[in-house]
């Protein structure tokens, strides 16, 4: 018999038996929210409360996970454990027996997941209240809708509120008849303490006609954010398409030339920055580079910058229904709200547009890892500390797309796909892989290779990385941490995508350092301005020369923006006096050896034959021309 406190809307849903049992046969009060205001009140534990501790009983003791503070401009979620403030790249485990290259629950923990799955359901049934959040993964306005649901214990309502800000949600009164979720996220924070040694663990269970995600921690990154990404990747793997890990921006110059750039790469690779306005000094100049040894500064005078029309921040849906006859890749956004990292905003005036949007929003926002005084304004440059004097490197705000200026709500045809990598300082005394110039032009075969290897790069702020600054791979597509299946399947999908969009071109952009020069993201912004001023004109072979390291493709012979030539050493790192050929070649070998090691895993019978030829070319130290010849487009 169904219990009391069950809203009628649950009877309209077609739910899996286990979820139906939780909702209809437990004593928990079931809440299907109607408004954002209701979700915020739930997160605060009451309409008039200004603070709310998120606590659970674990083995007879109260364990506090974090605190929610109500400010004038939104709510601030702060977790007590610094390890819960950013994503652990090893959080995903697979519970099912479908093909996967990810660690399974049995492999990692030595136990089957099914008993823990049943314990999770029993624990959820024992809660005083459960918040059920129906939502669509995909893009509602474009008609790409995959029904999903989250089931969240009442005292973790901050998670439900944040998820609704990231993915959108279907109000209780708008849930359609026969709503049948293709994926369900179950949230049970106590299990990280009772079963998983306090670690971030998200278990994925792919069933015949749906996917279950068990989030055993409250940090949004691996579940409410990337968990939904994994849902789209799993569906795309079955249907033959990809959701790309990319920001996208339409750039319109003062001369009304247009260019649409999609920027891919590992976390910290410059995706959010690609949609940001260029940062200027007080006198209006752009600080492009600072010599890390001498302190000498290089400025660029850019009189009028382009107008930016953001399309995507992190997840670009390349669904088959969007593609057209342009021979360019066509994408739309897969997110309702953007999970913006603001660690670079450390004082007032750093990024006025974002600061204004956060300090005076049109509706309350959700912040993470920020200092918060109840009833005051949360200031996005005031980050909490992981330890005394050590600011948290991952302060975040969830910014609904509708609150962004100049947002593009439809599709975008991609002129240029860029790929970002964080690079370290590189000198004769300390040779490293910071040998990439301000931008490189990649033939499509090399563009595919970079997406297979996806180096995570130097000083990544977004994730927990115990390995320091050793080079690591984010994995195929740079979205591999969120995928559940086989790497080779994603590699084949990416190659198919490149071959089917021959009019989209490819570049490589480093950030942080170019040789001895500290650049941050300035090189990315200046490259964007330069390419947009070209109006999408293709590079001719005579304007390019082979990079000294062949996997870096081509370098432009010269770059001039608004009449100012760019220092040639920022284009060809080996000619920097502090670097030279010898240090460059040491860095090139480090980079090439890393690529060769990472590419071995793709050499399987399932790999597309052309893909095998491209990988063989890397293994055999092919020339740039040989890479071009494999897919002869530029």
Model-derived features with residue positions:
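Long, basic/Gly/Ser/Thr-rich N-terminal segments
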Residues: 2-221
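Flexible loop/turn segments at secondary-structure boundaries
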Residues: 140, 221, 269-272, 282-284, ...
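N-terminal pre-Walker A segment at the start of P-loop NTPase domains
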Residues: 221-254
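Glycine-rich phosphate-binding P-loop
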Residues: 256-286
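Conserved, well-ordered active-site substructure
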Residues: 260-262, 325-339, 521-532
């Amino acid at each position: 018999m169904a219990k009391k406190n069950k809203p009628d809307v649950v009877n309209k849903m077609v739910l899996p038996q286990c979820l139906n049992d939780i909702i209809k046969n437990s004593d928990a009060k079931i809440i299907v929210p109607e408004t954002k205001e209701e979700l915020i009140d739930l997160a605060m534990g009451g309409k008039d409360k200004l603070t709310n501790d998120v606590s659970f009983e674990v083995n007879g003791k109260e364990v506090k996970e974090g605190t929610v503070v109500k400010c004038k401009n939104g709510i601030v979620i702060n977790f007590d454990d610094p390890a819960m403030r950013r994503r652990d790249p090893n959080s995903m485990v697979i519970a099912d027996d479908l093909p996967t290259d990810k660690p399974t629950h049995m492999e990692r923990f030595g136990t089957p997941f099914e008993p823990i799955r049943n314990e999770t359901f029993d624990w959820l049934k024992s809660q005083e209240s459960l918040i059920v959040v129906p939502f669509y993964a995909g893009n509602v306005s474009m008609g790409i809708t995959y029904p999903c649901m989250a089931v969240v214990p009442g005292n973790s309502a901050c998670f439900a509120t944040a998820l609704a800000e990231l993915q959108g949600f279907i109000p209780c009164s708008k849930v359609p008849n026969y709503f049948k979720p293709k994926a369900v996220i179950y949230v049970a924070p106590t299990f990280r303490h009772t079963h998983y040694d306090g670690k971030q663990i998200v278990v994925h269970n792919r069933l015949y006609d749906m996917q279950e995600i068990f989030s055993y921690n409250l940090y949004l990154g691996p579940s409410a954010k990337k968990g939904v990404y994994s849902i789209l990747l799993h569906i795309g793997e079955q249907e033959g398409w990809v959701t790309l890990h990319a920001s996208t921006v339409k750039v319109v110059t003062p001369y009304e030339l247009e260019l649409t750039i999609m920027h891919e790469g590992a976390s910290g690779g410059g995706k959010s920055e690609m949609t940001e306005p260029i940062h200027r000094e007080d006198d209006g100049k752009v600080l492009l580079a600072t010599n890390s040894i001498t302190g000498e500064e290089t400025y660029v005078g850019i009189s009028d910058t382009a107008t930016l029309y953001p399309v995507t921040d992190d997840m670009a849906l390349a669904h088959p229904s969007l593609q057209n006859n342009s021979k360019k890749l066509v994408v739309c956004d897969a997110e309702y709200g953007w999970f913006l990292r603001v660690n670079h905003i450390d004082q007032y005036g750093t990024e006025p547009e974002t600061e204004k949007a956060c300090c005076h929003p049109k509706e309350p926002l959700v912040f993470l890892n920020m200092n918060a005084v109840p009833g005051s304004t949360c200031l996005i440059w005031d980050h909490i500390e992981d330890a005394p004097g050590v600011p948290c490197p991952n302060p975040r705000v969830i910014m609904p797309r509708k609150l962004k200026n100049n947002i593009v709500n439809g599709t975008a045809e991609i002129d240029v796909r860029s790929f970002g990598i964080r690079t370290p300082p590189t000198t004769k005394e300390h040779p490293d892989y910071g040998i990439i110039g301000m931008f490189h032009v990649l033939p499509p075969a090399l563009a595919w290779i970079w997406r297979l290897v996806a180096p995570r790069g130097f000083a990544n702020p977004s994730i927990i990385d115990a390995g320091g600054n050793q080079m690591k791979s984010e994995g195929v597509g740079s979205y591999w941490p969120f995928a559940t299946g086989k790497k080779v399947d994603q590699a084949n999908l990416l190659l198919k995508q490149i071959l089917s969009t021959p009019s989209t071109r490819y570049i490589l952009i480093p950030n942080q350092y170019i040789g001895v020069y500290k650049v941050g993201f300035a090189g990315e912004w200046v490259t964007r301005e330069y390419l947009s001023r070209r109006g999408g004109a293709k590079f001719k072979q005579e304007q390019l020369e082979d990079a000294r390291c062949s996997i870096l493709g081509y370098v432009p012979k010269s770059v001039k923006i608004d009449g100012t030539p760019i220092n040639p050493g920022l284009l060809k790192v080996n000619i920097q006096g502090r670097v030279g050929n010898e240090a460059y070649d040491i860095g090139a070998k480090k980079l090439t050896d890393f690529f060769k090691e990472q590419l071995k895993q793709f050499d399987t019978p399932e790999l597309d034959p052309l893909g095998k030829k491209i990988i063989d070319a890397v293994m055999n130290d092919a020339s740039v021309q040989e890479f071009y010849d494999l897919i002869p487009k530029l």
